[in-house]
Structure formats: C-alpha cells, structure tokens
C-alpha cells in the first residue's frame, strides 16, 4: 500500500496544503503529525487577545478530530518527530515509525529571545500554546515591556495599550517597522502609539532582566532601569531547522528549497515559516497560500514553480492601520510621501521612475488594490 503524503506540522501552512491536496485528490493517503494539539486557530488573532479579553482556548476554530474527518486524513497530535531517514523514507517518534512516499516539513519558526541575563523571564506569543502558558501572567500584568518594534511588537503594543496596560516598547533601531519601511513612513505609527500612551525607547537594547518581589527589573543598554510585571520578546522568528539538519537537508537561515518547494533530498519538501525559498524567508500568510497551492500540485505529480506576485502585508494596528507591498526594504528607492489627516500614501520609485513599493494607511487603504495591480503589471 502506498504510504502517501506525510506532513510534519499542523499550522497554517500544513492546513492550507491539506485543503489544496483534497481539492485535487480525494483518495491519496495523508498523514499529519505534530507536537501540538493540532487544533486550528487563527494565529494573527494573538495580536489582539488583550483588548478583546480573550483566553487561549477561545481562539480554537476547529478540533483536530473535526479537521481529520472533514478532509479525510490521519492526524497524530502531541507527537514529536525525533528523526527522519530519507533513505528508508520514514520518520520516527520514539519507538514509533511511519513511512512516506512524499514528506513535507511544515514545522514553522520559533520566536527569538535575546540571550541576556534573565532571558528566561521573557515570554513569547508565537503560538496558541505559548499564550496559554503565559495568559494568567499577561492578563494580570499592568506594566508590560515589549522588546522589538517590528510587525508583531507594534500590534501587541497597541493592543495592550487599548486594554489599559502601561506599555513600554524597546527597539534597537531608530524607528518602528525598520525592517519593513523607511522612517519617513513609519513615523505616523510612532506618533499614534505615543499619543495612546505607549512609551517608545528607540536606539536602545535590553541589557538584563532581574526578578524581584515587586516585579521584574529591566536594565537597558544606557543604564536606565524599568519596573514591569511582564516582558515579551518580539524580535523576530528563527526557522526550525534542527530536524532538517539531522536529516542531512541543506539549510541556511531556513530549510533551503527550490521554486518547486523541494529540499536537497528527493521526495522531501518544506513549506511555510521554516522554508527558505531560493534565498527568501517569507513568513506571511499570502506567500504560504500561493506556495501551498503549488506544492499540492507537485506532490500529485506536477513540476510547477511557485510564482509569487507582489502581495499585501497588513499591519493590524486598529488606531492606525497600514498596508504595504513591494520591495519596501530596498535602500535605493526614492520615496514620495503624502500625509493627510485621513491617511498616508507613500510610493517608492526606482531610478527609472517605476513604482516598486507602496505603503498606505487609514482611509487611503482603499487605494491598495489599484497600486498592487500597478506593481504586478511590472513583474
């Protein structure tokens, strides 16, 4: 009997792949194995649980049993794969062994925690289980330190402030969202957060955390000390590559795959936050959706290359929502920025005056799809 397709992981990437496989083939055996509960939840909602006063359990959308029944697959929750044998085409968890015809690693990425003294006091919110583990502390905390002014850090800072907490956001760069956009565009969000009451400490790094009876003492690189009830690390994600390394797959920042999502080993693929697609890490929902559609076809016999158009990235900060697309990180773009009371439009042009990126906020977000169409016409 054909052992079929074996997927390691149960997050958004894995589920998108299962759904795409079943749209094309109702018979191929699918087995999904993951270390977590395998229940479905919407990960972006983790950035808004505090203002909505939600618990971790309230985020669950579908149990693993219902998912398995709906899409006709075998699911193994709370099962950690400890080894892969690509020669024998099998995976192992302790004494248990499963064979595969095609193997997909959709094992995600882990939140990075700066290795400063007291780093074990830092919390992360990269999964439903991580929120479940820390929700009592975070829901009760009044003074919160957020380390990292990127996408998730800004979303959490605004949400916690809306929930009535005293929030301090620390980032080593000189502006928010520095990995996504120029300072001229992000200053509007910076002003909005400060107006809400978020204390922004930019060009600063965390030096140490110390637990005391009255709370956690955070010491910054400039010597300043803060007293907080909780500290959250939001400085980025590191792809989970340990299992792939053990299996002899080529890894760089993530598990290296080509444009067909194939790893360096035959019949082994990677998808989602763990995958490095031709040198790029793309930990956003839309690239994963496109990749899952392509990979499903390839697992069923095709040899298609994933095509990733310019896609919208949404910054879910309700008091000042933003959308961006294109090569916003390019250093050689010339930006034109129009800031009005009803919103901002920022356009990045290359040396040939071709539109290569844009950022829109508030009421001007209605222009996003037209600008996106213009971007994709150039590719």
From Swiss-Prot:
GO cellular component term of the entry, any: cytoplasm
Top-rank taxon, per record: Bacteria
Keyword Oxidoreductase: yes
Disulfide bond annotation, renumbered to this chain: none
A Pfam family that the UniProt record links to this protein: Rbx_binding
Major place of residence: cytoplasm
Family, similarity comment: Belongs to the FAD-dependent oxidoreductase family.
Protein name stated in the entry: Nitric oxide reductase FlRd-NAD(+) reductase
Organism for this UniProt entry: Serratia proteamaculans (strain 568)
Source organism phylogeny: Bacteria, Pseudomonadati, Pseudomonadota, Gammaproteobacteria, Enterobacterales
Gene from which the chain derives: norW
């Amino acid at each position: 009997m054909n052992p079929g397709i074996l997927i390691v992981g149960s997050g958004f990437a894995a589920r998108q792949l299962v759904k795409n496989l079943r749209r094309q083939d109702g018979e191929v055996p699918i087995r999904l194995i993951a270390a977590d509960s395998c229940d479905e939840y919407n990960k972006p909602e983790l950035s808004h649980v505090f203002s909505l006063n939600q618990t971790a359990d309230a985020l669950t959308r579908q149990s693993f049993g219902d998912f398995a029944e709906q899409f006709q697959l075998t699911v193994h929750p709370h099962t950690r794969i400890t080894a892969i044998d690509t020669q024998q085409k099998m995976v192992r968890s302790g004494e248990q062994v499963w064979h595969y015809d095609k193997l997909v690693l959709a094992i995600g990425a882990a939140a990075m925690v700066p290795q400063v003294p007291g780093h074990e006091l830092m919390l992360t919110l990269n999964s439903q289980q991580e929120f479940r583990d820390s929700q009592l502390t975070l829901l009760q905390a009044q003074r919160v330190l957020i380390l990292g002014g990127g996408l998730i850090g800004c979303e959490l800072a605004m949400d916690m402030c809306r929930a009535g907490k005293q929030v301090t956001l620390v980032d080593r760069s000189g502006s928010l969202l520095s990995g996504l956009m120029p300072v001229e565009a992000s200053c509007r969000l910076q002003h909005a957060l400060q107006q809400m009451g978020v204390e922004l400490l930019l060009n600063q790094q965390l030096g140490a955390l110390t637990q005391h009876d009255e709370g956690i003492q955070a010491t910054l690189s400039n010597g300043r000390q803060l007293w907080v009830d909780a500290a959250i690390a939001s400085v980025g994600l590191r792809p989970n590559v340990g299992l792939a390394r053990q299996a002899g797959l080529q890894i760089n920042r993530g598990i290296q795959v080509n444009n067909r999502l194939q790893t360096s080993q035959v019949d082994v693929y990677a998808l989602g936050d763990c995958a490095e697609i031709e040198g790029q890490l793309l930990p956003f929902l839309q690239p994963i959706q496109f990749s899952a559609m392509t990979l499903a076809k390839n697992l069923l016999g095709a040899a298609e290359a994933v095509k990733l158009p310019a896609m919208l990235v949404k910054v879910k900060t309700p008091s000042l929502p933003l959308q961006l697309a294109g090569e916003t990180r390019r250093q050689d773009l010339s930006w034109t920025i129009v800031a009005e009371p009803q919103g901002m439009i920022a356009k990045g042009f290359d040396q040939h005056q071709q539109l290569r990126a844009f950022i829109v906020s508030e009421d001007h977000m209605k222009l996003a799809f037209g600008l996106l169409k213009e971007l994709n016409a150039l590719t």
